[in-house]
């Protein structure tokens, strides 16, 4: 079993321990089961951010204050848990994008979404790396689709206002954010990593419309 999944532990301990996968709508769970699921997600988010993807399910259970069987009933494998956290992140960003559409300044609304995305990515690099390395975590996410649609609307709005260069598209955003994450990741050798705030502002400046000027090589 790889480090991603940690130690394999049977999760069916009794007749009651029937797996409830992440395909189950959390809203259909009993109130106590829903609370336990939320506690597991909160603990997993904290443990992954602090210790990376090598965290075992038993550690998450201890941090959540529940039995390991409870963790496995909701998330039979670590990948299921990561999928739920990724979907939760997409939902958070989509809500931010929806709010940004209400900003009368289209450019300011777009920048607000990008800053929030960069901040969350920097604070929880383990989940960010998992989402980049394991594309299957994100392929079936309805929240990801919603985020993409809202991001496209934000970009078109900023372009229509003249605040953003016309050749930028929503398809460029994931690559830019991955580049930002890699450039600002802490490392053991070489020069210190640039802060994500500084790198992001440089990137945003590059999305402004190009200024008119004389091309190199022209006559004076």
Predicted stretch roles:
Residues 84, 91, 95-123, 136-139, ...:
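Hydrophobic alpha-helical connector segments
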Residues 1-63, 80-83:
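Basic, helix-initiating cap at the start of DNA-binding domains
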Residues 135-186, 194, 198:
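Amphipathic alpha-helical packing segments from all-alpha helical-bundle domains
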Residues 39, 59, 108-116, 146, ...:
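Amphipathic alpha-helical interaction segments
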Residues 65-75:
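Short hydrophobic/aromatic patch on the recognition helix
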Residues 1-24, 148-160, 186-220:
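C-terminal peripheral helix-coil segments that are non-catalytic and often amphipathic
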Residues 34-42, 49, 53-54, 74-95, ...:
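An amphipathic alpha-helix adjacent to DNA-recognition modules
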Residues 129-138, 217-219:
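Short linear capping/connector segments at secondary-structure termini
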